């Protein structure tokens, strides 16, 4: 009753679900009361929200499907690219922004990994790099870091305390083990204290969502766009849940869908939300067992459904370096120009991007969540010449190239 009253107070007529003023039609009153008693509050809320969405879809004009000419808006686009290149706020790490052109609005990026190889840690790093205005640099100390954009982090596995210590480690450059064991060296404790202060003034919002439906994810993203001005969303990670299975069964009248279809629907909805609300979304998946032997690490390694990759703008896998990699890189490493990599990041899809079918050879410090690509090769170990693109953020939402 409280939920229905709240909708009614907002001017939404819910009398077709329950009409408290009805005293004459006893049969209708009994049917409505039985429905309320046997329906949980989430289903009631979703039903009302779906009805509102249908009204919006019917009466709000859409620009999709209109016939257009190749020269429509061409001069304006050319001038816009002169003033502001097609880049987004920078992500963390050398070479990453050369490949991705930053976290671009209306784009969906997917970064997957086997369990335990850094999917969450790299996402935490990007959340902090987007949302914090200072970060500790091993060479220069505390340095300014952009404009601290509003960012939402939805975690499906880790609790808040687990996320917090990873964030402290990344921002301060202090190994998480030192934080967890309360055994600091030198000025590390002071750096962690400052990291906590930086997070306190940031615009980072964290939501724990261990069991979720498609509607839950959509509502949380829309709510934080509306209430917190969020433009960057990190969702860890794309998977099936009991609630999604129940939701799909309810929508399809009990028809069961395969896991790959459900995962495709979730990734498709994330991409639609990115387009509809003009936000950037970063997500991830687990990998299947084939990652150990694959020489072409592409979408076929995605656990559950390779069709997830159909909806994304950028696809990457984080993979461990094996002996075969070190043998293939022997000549490069012998020159002592680079440290020995312990991680390789495979870029298998890059819509409107130059680099794909490549590895970013990376030195990963799991303790501080800092993954630093050093150089790039093809999947066949051929060295690629690649510059480290610097994206400059001077004003909120305004980016340029250095």
Spell out what each predicted region is:
Residues 1-74:
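Short, small/acidic-rich helices and loops at N termini and domain boundaries
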Residues 60-174, 401:
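The Walker A/P-loop phosphate-binding site
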Residues 98, 133-229, 299, 359:
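Cytosolic-facing regulatory segments adjacent to core modules
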Residues 153, 234-235, 279-285:
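Structural recognition of the conserved hydrophobic beta-strand(s) that form the central parallel beta-sheet
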Residues 160-164, 241-247, 290-293:
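Short acidic/His/Gly/Ser-rich catalytic and metal-binding motifs that mark active-site loops
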Residues 173, 177, 181, 214-230, ...:
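C-terminal regions of RecA-like/P-loop NTPase motor modules
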Residues 198-205, 269-281, 311-313:
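A structural motif corresponding to the C-terminal end of an alpha-helix
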Residues 205-273:
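Phosphate-binding/switch loop-helix module in NTP-utilizing enzymes
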């Amino acid at each position: 009753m409280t939920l229905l009253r709240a909708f009614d107070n907002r001017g939404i007529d819910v009398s077709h679900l329950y009409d408290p003023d009805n005293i004459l039609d006893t049969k209708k009153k009994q049917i409505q009361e039985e429905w309320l008693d046997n329906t949980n509050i989430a289903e009631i809320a979703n039903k009302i929200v779906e009805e509102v969405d249908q009204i919006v879809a019917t009466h709000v004009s859409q620009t999709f499907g209109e016939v257009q000419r190749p020269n429509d808006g061409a001069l304006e686009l050319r001038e816009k690219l002169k003033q502001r290149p097609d880049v987004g706020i920078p992500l963390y790490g050398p070479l990453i922004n050369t490949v991705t052109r930053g976290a671009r609005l209306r784009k969906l990026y997917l970064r997957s990994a086997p369990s335990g190889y850094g999917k969450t840690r790299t996402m935490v790093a990007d959340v902090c790099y987007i949302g914090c205005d200072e970060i500790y640099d091993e060479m220069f100390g505390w340095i300014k870091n952009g404009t601290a954009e509003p960012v939402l982090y939805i975690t499906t596995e880790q609790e808040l305390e687990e996320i917090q210590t990873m964030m402290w480690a990344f921002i301060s450059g202090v190994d998480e083990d030192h934080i967890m064991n309360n055994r600091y060296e030198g000025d590390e404790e002071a750096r962690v204290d400052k990291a906590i202060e930086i997070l306190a003034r940031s615009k980072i919002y964290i939501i724990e969502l261990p069991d979720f439906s498609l509607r839950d994810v959509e509502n949380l993203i829309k709510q934080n766009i509306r209430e917190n001005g969020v433009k960057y969303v990190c969702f860890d990670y794309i998977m099936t849940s009991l609630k999604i299975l129940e939701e799909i069964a309810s929508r399809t009248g009990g028809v069961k869908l395969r896991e790959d279809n459900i995962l495709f629907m979730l990734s498709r909805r994330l991409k639609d939300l990115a387009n509809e609300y003009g936000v950037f979304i970063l997500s991830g998946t687990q990998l299947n067992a084939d990652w150990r032997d694959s020489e072409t690490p592409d979408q076929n390694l995605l656990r559950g459904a390779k069709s997830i990759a159909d909806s994304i703008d950028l696809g990457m896998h984080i993979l461990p370096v094996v002996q075969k990699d070190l043998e293939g890189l022997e000549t490069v490493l012998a020159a002592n120009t680079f440290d020995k990599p312990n991680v390789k990041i495979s870029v298998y899809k890059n819509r409107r991007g130059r680099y794909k079918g490549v590895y970013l050879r990376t030195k990963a410090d799991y303790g501080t969540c800092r993954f630093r690509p050093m150089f790039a090769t093809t999947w066949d170990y051929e060295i690629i010449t690649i510059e480290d693109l610097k994206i400059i953020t001077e004003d909120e939402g305004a980016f340029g190239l250095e």
